[in-house]
Amino acid sequence: MSRWLWPWSNCVKERVCRYLLHHYLGHFFQEHLSLDQLSLDLYKGSVALRDIHLEIWSVNEVLESMESPLELVEGFVGSIEVAVPWAALLTDHCTVRVSGLQLTLQPRRGPAPGAADSQSWASCMTTSLQLAQECLRDGLPEPSEPPQPLEGLEMFAQTIETVLRRIKVTFLDTVVRVEHSPGDGERGVAVEVRVQRLEYCDEAVRDPSQAPPVDVHQPPAFLHKLLQLAGVRLHYEELPAQEEPPEPPLQIGSCSGYMELMVKLKQNEAFPGPKLEVAGQLGSLHLLLTPRQLQQLQELLSAVSLTDHEGLADKLNKSRPLGAEDLWLIEQDLNQQLQAGAVAEPLSPDPLTNPLLNLDNTDLFFSMAGLTSSVASALSELSLSDVDLASSVRSDMASRRLSAQAHPAGKMAPNPLLDTMRPDSLLKMTLGGVTLTLLQTSAPSSGPPDLATHFFTEFDATKDGPFGSRDFHHLRPRFQRACPCSHVRLTGTAVQLSWELRTGSRGRRTTSMEVHFGQLEVLECLWPRGTSEPEYTEILTFPGTLGSQASARPCAHLRHTQILRRVPKSRPRRSVACHCHSELALDLANFQADVELGALDRLAALLRLATVPAEPPAGLLTEPLPAMEQQTVFRLSAPRATLRLRFPIADLRPEPDPWAGQAVRAEQLRLELSEPQFRSELSSGPGPPVPTHLELTCSDLHGIYEDGGKPPVPCLRVSKALDPKSTGRKYFLPQVVVTVNPQSSSTQWEVAPEKGEELELSVESPCELREPEPSPFSSKRTMYETEEMVIPGDPEEMRTFQSRTLALSRCSLEVILPSVHIFLPSKEVYESIYNRINNDLLMWEPADLLPTPDPAAQPSGFPGPSGFWHDSFKMCKSAFKLANCFDLTPDSDSDDEDAHFFSVGASGGPQAAAPEAPSLHLQSTFSTLVTVLKGRITALCETKDEGGKRLEAVHGELVLDMEHGTLFSVSQYCGQPGLGYFCLEAEKATLYHRAAVDDYPLPSHLDLPSFAPPAQLAPTIYPSEEGVTERGASGRKGQGRGPHMLSTAVRIHLDPHKNVKEFLVTLRLHKATLRHYMALPEQSWHSQLLEFLDVLDDPVLGYLPPTVITILHTHLFSCSVDYRPLYLPVRVLITAETFTLSSNIIMDTSTFLLRFILDDSALYLSDKCEVETLDLRRDYVCVLDVDLLELVIKTWKGSTEGKLSQPLFELRCSNNVVHVHSCADSCALLVNLLQYVMSTGDLHPPPRPPSPTEIAGQKLSESPASLPSCPPVETALINQRDLADALLDTERSLRELAQPSGGHLPQASPISVYLFPGERSGAPPPSPPVGGPAGSLGSCSEEKEDEREEEGDGDTLDSDEFCILDAPGLGIPPRDGEPVVTQLHPGPIVVRDGYFSRPIGSTDLLRAPAHFPVPSTRVVLREVSLVWHLYGGRDFGPHPGHRARTGLSGPRSSPSRCSGPNRPQNSWRTQGGSGRQHHVLMEIQLSKVSFQHEVYPAEPATGPAAPSQELEERPLSRQVFIVQELEVRDRLASSQINKFLYLHTSERMPRRAHSNMLTIKALHVAPTTNLGGPECCLRVSLMPLRLNVDQDALFFLKDFFTSLVAGINPVVPGETSAEARPETRAQPSSPLEGQAEGVETTGSQEAPGGGHSPSPPDQQPIYFREFRFTSEVPIWLDYHGKHVTMDQVGTFAGLLIGLAQLNCSELKLKRLCCRHGLLGVDKVLGYALNEWLQDIRKNQLPGLLGGVGPMHSVVQLFQGFRDLLWLPIEQYRKDGRLMRGLQRGAASFGSSTASAALELSNRLVQAIQATAETVYDILSPAAPVSRSLQDKRSARRLRRGQQPADLREGVAKAYDTVREGILDTAQTICDVASRGHEQKGLTGAVGGVIRQLPPTVVKPLILATEATSSLLGGMRNQIVPDAHKDHALKWRSDSAQD
């Protein structure tokens, strides 16, 4: 180098300097530089230029060549100073100093030219050799010496190269300004980058030793440049309008510290590596932005597009021949496709992973752009737009989704293009720290006026860096001082940024970026108004990285990859120019985040501003610009994550202030996630929008509920679970998927019709069959009466509804929980969680942070409505078809709903197929689907004692297990704001419970349960076992999968105008079993569950709770109740095939209605208590079978006035029929069970029963017809007046016994006031006491009252408002017997129309009189039919092998007939136990039984009755028991009787309409002195009876009830305890509620003493103050003895019973009236029986003996002769009508004498027939008769028992008898002859015929007598039709034989 140190000449120096300036900078100047214009100091080597304006065109030309997206608008240079060290040119560096450089740029408009081929801006434009040649050739004066050889030129070039490498450029106060004006009237924006100092030099300047040697022929492969910056500031300016003065730019960012950039440039393409590599370091970066600035910067960055996709596509979309590279690409793609086809993997929806779906890569297959296929294009768009559109409901679909998305985060899918990509640029930056402060308001009201200046002054003033510590908490005070307003702040340290650009052929580019954060924190700092301290929300923090490992592993790693490829524009119907696929992966360390909805709402508003797309103004006829099809995949993963869910305080007031501070509760839910992974996919493009999926998975989730200072409670645990269907260890992971579907057209006008739809517009189908709309309710209509029963849909209907709703929802949330455990340690925690979630989280509404007022009031920082949408023209739809569009009825689903959406800018067919038909269905707002594979809910509740006090140290526990459960919810269904649905399903559910469990410490960490039954809890509700359900036991298999065990569907409808919310709740429980456990009322499972769920709602600000109406429909199908008593050896099972509960529940209303419908239910008993699992058919006995039962409960809270207008509690029951199937032992066991349940036997161990001798002695000491010798306190405290009245009644009853049964004496007793108070309507007031002046009137009225009550019910007449007139002496017969006409009114009778009101409907026999008070409690049973089947034998216990018949043993037994095909044992429910005898059966049927029990309030209500009566007698309760028809049927095989007991009717005694066979009425009244217990007035009425008694049936009933009574355990009261007895109350009616039902039916019911009684609370018998048997009951008795029995009843009685034959014996039960008081039901029965027996013995023996044998017919015979002679005389004496008397006598003679004669003749003929049959049997040979002949004889004998209805049938039957007899005789002779011939030949045949001759001779006599009997019977029935009816009821017919 020494030879180059010769001195330079001045001419050369001037030319070199001028040339350098002109060559490098001349064309950028507006004026050409010359030597004269230069300010040169050649000796010092400096050049200076000032105030230079840049040439815009030249600079833009350079920028275009570099593909810069910016262009220069204005450029100015303050000064340029160039210093050349001539003395040390090769050792020192040249300097260029540029001061005051100002560049104003703007985004380039229009396409850019071709790609840049030169990089001279970095390599100084040319080589040094060229520079040397030009320099020496440019105008140098001709030297005197000759030119230097070529070596000198190279040495000169080497010198120049050395000098150029050492040039150092310094920029001072540089300002780069980028302006952007949208051009649509909006204000522009400008961003300035101000650099205080920038130094640019080669790396050789810093370290000359590392510089490569200079070679002018071979330039270095890499160039290294160094940039050093200092004082970098970012400023923002909003361009003002023309008339407004400009404002100074506002600083938005600063770079503190020293910045250094190392630029590495590759000059030789043969070397690997990127062409450009930049590595830099930066101290820290601070940014301060407002929402307005953020939006404007986003628009600026959108305008400054780094890649012009349209220009790129235009350049590269050229047709060219296939080259070698193209062939290689085709070969590579084909190989990959073949390999993928061999593996046979499913097609992935990702266009990068599956080349078959990614047909947009047409350059891989076709080089010519015109060869693309439109079909392939449509298929490609279909595949990209329909990805995961239909969401999955079932778990297997979820597992498929998990497996399909199993790619590891950050790993790119294999792409054949990546191998051919070449690195182009690489950027690596290291930042010491980054802070981004985003203001939440544009103009903060608080803080200093110049916030930006104050902010950056605070940070620039500090000497030390802001990131000196590893904790960010020390920065918070500095930020409080720097920015005292609400903002969101991102703070990061040790930031490493890496950016790489790869390019390839066909215009493909790949951009990848990685960012590492050593520490990271994202905070929201909210400054409430008027506060000095902010409130922080830690959006993202990393508490675990603050230790020593912070530098070892970054807390956040962000990877972003973008692949850009072009799409040919020659493809039809596509306006897309580029396809961009981006993948963003974020790997975090263990992080923590606060989830606060208010903060997220404010943050989302800011992010929404940054993501608003800038749309160009669209005209009517303008063609849409080419758009970019973009697909972005976002992935986030971390080892662990902690999410703290903060519950907001819901504020629904009209104008809430979102900036008033954090409106959050003190409680929070901490969610700890293990291995969380988040994935999202966003797509945008010109085609139809596609759904957006957000997916979050984790392996484990632990939820902890924190309530202020209380200890944290672990309440939730979710974990993965093994797939039971998978062979390997495949897990289901917890998963949350959020799907945001694109918003469909806002109106129905924005739908373009298809071709088929256009045809449909012209031709409408007259009959259009549509499928029903999907619904969560069952489409099968189920009606009950006139009401439709709403039932949840089956699983298929549920799935259809859910999948359709999810697909048509604006936003859907799907949650999969493989294994979940919810723990609720107390009601307080549950109430807190309930209110936080239901009343805070779900009621929270986002604030209106993006208002859209008028432009004048538009705040800065928020876009107007034009920024979000633009108006565009759509195709108008025909109004004719529009009617179907708006048809949202359930029948509006048809095939034409599959219309597709068309893009407005598209041409041709549809772009993509829609998943459903949103054209006819509006979108729902939000839908949720939660799937639980296995789940458990554990709830700890309080345990209370019988007094309602909480027990210490114990608690109740409820555990609910669920398998395969789904929870679905949708709000604003089909766009209707007030409509929503809620569904809950579970294939299997089990409830465990225990009332009292010892307290144990709560777990600090919730473990996953094993889902095994809890050991300390008892199963309460569980799936029915295989052998329990009736259908399951019947072996019905192969019918597929039935409904789920639990199904619930709820429809929620809110009427905002009325503020009424209606819930339609339907619940179905299928094949479930309830295990019943007796417990205290406060400790039952339902009491504890309801008490646990009964929480109070916290008020919500600005929310008025609507009136809630709940319509409840609960359906139980094939369910059962299992009860196993502790101290009774029996197991009880109640099954119900269908059980429906319906109710209307209205909050804040006084009335509540509940209806139960029970269909096909049964009660079973079993004595196998030691076996755990039993079979229903094998081990149980059905004792109760209910066909249909309806139960209605109505409650009323009462009025504020305290008066009752309706009962507080009313129960109504009605049913079809109830069957009771029992033997004596099973019936006794049923009675014992009822007693056990009523006495709550499980809660009281059985005490020692008293000895039988004590019980017998007690019974013998009591006289049945007298009062007890030692009356109880209640009886002793009767007032003196009642005692006197009782004595008078006793004396009168003795006088009545001496009179005939029909005679009555005047009764003058004042006791009449005690006769059913109020049941007389229109009667005069009660008579005064004894001795009063109105005693005679009282006696007359009392007698007439008696007669009237005997004829009918007084209250019936009273209820219909009719009045019976009472007249003195009415009804008393005269002494001489002559009738006397009494004139009541002397004048004419005036008839007044309408005087009596007409009854509205039929008479209600159960209704109380009108003046009775309104009852507080009413129990009504209406038309309940009961059939009691009494079987012989035993259902339980040991049974003999031969199964002897109990009750028919010994000589009483008769040969039983064969059972027909319809016997009861063919029905499995009636098969009973192994010892049940089905041929021994009797049936007791009570048809249409009605019962009413009313309890009246303690205070008497005002009524029309007299005050004196109310003061004397106050009703407490009233009972009415009515049996419309009572029958006892004889079904014994040994008996021919049909009906054992029934109602007797005849022509003389026809049955009255609406008459009841048995009526019992009881009225309990309070005594007048209030000293005793309640007193009862009892009235019984009975209709005439007919008894047909067979001896076997009589003895069977005797044995049955004897065994029944012996098997019933005696009622022994248990220990008196607080829970076993009712508490003493002030209301005397309270203890009567439990006694009312048993007053009429059983005598064992007792009532406890009233609260006003001073007696001990032991139960006392009922005191009957009055007992009346109101009607005289005639009884007709037929008895048929069969055999003598002397072993049980004695010799005489046995002979009498066996030989007696009674026919129409008449008995009468006389009227009874007992007013002297009876204590106990047994005394009442004893009194009635004693009275009736005495009357029968004294007065009715002739009528009883008149039916012995034929005596009845004989008496009728003489009665007819007497009537024939006496009736004319009696009629003549009466009124002189002799002919009328003759007619009556002849009629009586015909009906009595003729029928009696025919009956006697028939008896004689039947006696002859019986004698002939006996002779026939004696003379008949012993040879067997054929079976067919026996069958014919038996059939004829059965028909023989049926008498003909009239003479015609008698003649026909006689003819048939003779004909069949002759045929039978001939057939018998033929059979005997043929059989004898077969055995012995001719001799045998002749012998057989001879042996058959004697019976054949007798046979005509039998036939003649039988035919005569038929004729006589027909004649008798013709004369007396009642005889035929009685015969048909008495004897069995052909159908009854079976």
Curated annotation (Swiss-Prot):
Residue ranges, annotated region (WIPI-interacting): 1358-1404
Any GO molecular function: phosphatidylinositol-3-phosphate binding
TM annotation in the entry: none
Mutation effect (L223E): In Mutant 1; abolished lipid transfer activity
Impact after mutating T1382Q: Decreased interaction with WDR45/WIPI4 and ability to promote autophagy
Amino acid composition bias (Acidic residues), ranges on this chain: 1343-1359
Subcellular location: Preautophagosomal structure membrane; Lipid droplet; Endoplasmic reticulum membrane
The Chorein N-terminal domain, residue ranges: 14-111
Region entry Disordered, spans: 1242-1272, 1315-1359, 1438-1476, 1614-1657
Reported effect, Y200R: In Mutant 1; abolished lipid transfer activity
Membrane topology, as annotated: Peripheral membrane protein
Known outcome of mutating Y1395A: Decreased interaction with WDR45/WIPI4 and ability to promote autophagy
Composition bias type Low complexity, residue spans: 1446-1464
Domain writeup: The chorein N-terminal domain mediates lipid transfer activity.
Subunit structure: Interacts with ATG9A (via C-terminus). Interacts (via WIPI-interacting region) with WDR45B/WIPI3. Interacts (via WIPI-interacting region) with WDR45/WIPI4. Interacts with TMEM41B. Interacts with VMP1.
Similarity comment: Belongs to the ATG2 family.
Protein name: Autophagy-related protein 2 homolog A
Natural source organism: Homo sapiens
Gene this protein is translated from: ATG2A
